[in-house]
Amino acid sequence: WMAQVATERLNQMQDPELSINQALVDYKRLGYSDNWINQRLKSIEIRKDLTDEWKRHGLQEGVQFATLTDIIYQTWSDMTAKEYKQFKGLKKENLRDNMTNKELVLNMLAELSTKEISESKNPETFREHMDVAEAGGEIARNARMELEAKTGKAVISPLNAKTGIALNSSPEEEDTKE
């Protein structure tokens, strides 16, 4: 069994597409909808682009990335990552794996905007990176507020993977759960 897992991992290192295919299988096995899976894979790509931008500026994974991520979350959702996880009833689970489609889209907008602003402004100090993270989050916050105003529905949802978010449902069905 261990040898098989090691072989699969080595094969995935040689051909990263195998890892992506495995992620698709895993999400499907967990009951996620195709639409949600596509959104989640795109969110992984956008997050990687953002962290690559941070690395390009010499920022460190860990505390600096977590601080900037918290600023992004706090700005667009009015909650830090920890508060957001508590709101959704999560302990160690991945927050993004427990976001609704709308939450994922807004988080992607916040992270994409942060990366774009960083590329444009070329921040030099950590304080400047914090300001950029806030500016990126603000773009998604404005979109969230406008959507909530026009629909009369909250975008931020306590739904998570255990409570049925995106599990074999259409976007319309997901809307009725919120």
Residue ranges with predicted function:
Residues 1-178:
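Positively charged, phosphate-engaging catalytic surfaces used for nucleic-acid and nucleotide handling
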